[in-house]
A protein has these predicted regions:
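A short, well-structured edge-of-sheet supersecondary motif
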Residues: 6-41, 48, 95, 104-110, ...
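Short, surface-exposed loop or secondary-structure junction motifs
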Residues: 86-294
Length: 393
């Protein structure tokens, strides 16, 4: 176990208790370093959450390579149930080029059938403002990919990603005998504009993401945006396979990593920098999902549950964080008007402890995403001896 990585990990698992478990792997060339702390082991099964989109994106790029999917064709060409997307090319969903909305919130639907009906009624409109990232495109791309491949999304991911990578511990439906190894994402606490929300009773093997919980549950019918579960050893295999071009070729990797959405705004801020179902380097590191030691051809993504995956094919680098920021944690705090995080007793960076109305004191993982650079990515860079990569390179 690497000591420098462990030092970075323990900031989250012990010093602040932001995470109940965290395991890390990083690699350069033929070298791989790992460390873990808290309730984490090699057999631990983590909910990948939005990191699932990397599998969706790579599977779809493979269909394109094989001539089975044409990005210029409209979504409804592949699945006529998307009647309002007759003029929206598949490319627009892959590249976050449009905003897609459902008539009602999918996580508010009472059952799978009503959620599917809402998804099939999705409409697209021009993207406005800073944010372009959304789960809905990947949820629709699932059905596009299934139609093009003539199989289920779970089977497509198995054939195009898991088998080439030699991954045997990644599932849309966790085997019964491995449910005991699943991280628990129960008792999530949220405060949204004065409303106190406790989400309890989530079973192991059911995706934490509320939309995936409704649509996928424990059926194994993989959603495109979330729903995969994996272990650290398997995610190392995934990253190695991407770097070794075992899943898709050089051209596809380069295409995924091109900035499709990012640009400066008049107020001095930027829109999000996104590639094809992934993030790419942002010029302002605070907003970048991609670490400073990776370059313009790198891509990656985070997952709400406490995960991060990034790869730099040009430099032969990868980083994986699998963590749990949900279990009995305050994950979201949207302050009431005129208030800040400190008014709730937290530090300005979102860490600290909060006393719930029932008297229980719980750790906060609010704004965890912005703490990764200082404590995890810095440890990775020092471990592997990686310099900062200028955006000019």
């Amino acid at each position: 176990m690497n000591g420098r990585l462990l030092e970075g990990i323990r900031f989250f698992t012990r010093e602040t208790e932001i995470l109940s478990a965290l395991c890390v792997a990083c690699g350069a060339g033929g070298r791989t370093e790992t460390a873990a702390d808290g309730d984490a082991a090699d057999r631990s099964v983590f909910d990948l959450a939005s990191a699932t989109k990397l599998f969706t994106g790579l599977s779809i790029m493979k269909l394109k390579e094989d001539g089975l999917l044409d990005f210029s064709r409209p979504v409804s060409y592949y699945d006529p149930r998307f009647t309002a997307l007759r003029d929206v090319p598949v490319w627009d969903l892959m590249a976050f080029a449009v905003t897609v909305r459902t008539p009602v919130r999918l996580d508010a639907c009472p059952d799978r059938d009503s959620a599917l009906a809402a998804l099939f009624a999705s409409e697209a409109m021009p993207t406005a403002g800073r944010r372009a990232y959304s789960d809905i495109p990947a949820m629709i791309l699932k059905y596009v990919a299934e139609a093009a491949a003539g199989t289920t999304m779970a089977e497509l991911v198995r054939k195009t990603v898991l088998e080439p990578a030699g991954m045997t511990e990644t599932w849309a439906k966790v085997p019964e005998e491995r449910l005991a190894d699943c991280q628990r994402y129960d008792r999530e606490h949220r405060i949204e504009n004065g409303k106190y929300i406790l989400r309890a009773g989530l079973r192991p093997g059911v995706p934490h993401d509320p939309k995936a919980a409704v649509l996928q549950g424990d059926t194994g019918d993989l959603c495109g945006h979330a729903g995969l579960f994996s272990t650290l050893p398997d995610m190392i295999r995934f990253c190695r396979a991407v770097l070794e071009r075992k899943i898709v070729g050089e051209e596809s990797l380069r295409e995924m990593a091109v900035n499709r959405t990012g640009r400066p705004l008049e107020d001095g801020t930027h829109t999000q920098y996104l590639g094809l179902q992934c993030y790419v380097r942002h010029p302002v590191q605070y907003w970048s999902e991609i670490p400073v030691y990776m370059g313009r051809e790198a891509f990656g993504i985070g997952g709400f549950t406490g995960n991060h995956v990034s790869v730099d094919p040009a430099r032969g680098l990868f980083t994986v964080f699998l963590g749990n920021r949900v279990l009995n944690r305050l994950t979201v705090l949207l302050p009431e008007e005129g208030k800040t995080l400190t008014d709730y007793g937290l530090r300005a960076d979102g860490s600290g402890y909060f006393r719930w109305p029932d008297g229980e004191v719980i750790p906060s993982s609010v704004k965890y995403v912005h703490q990764k650079d200082a404590h995890l990515h810095r440890a990775v860079a020092e471990t592997l001896g990686l310099p900062e990569v200028s955006m000019e390179q």
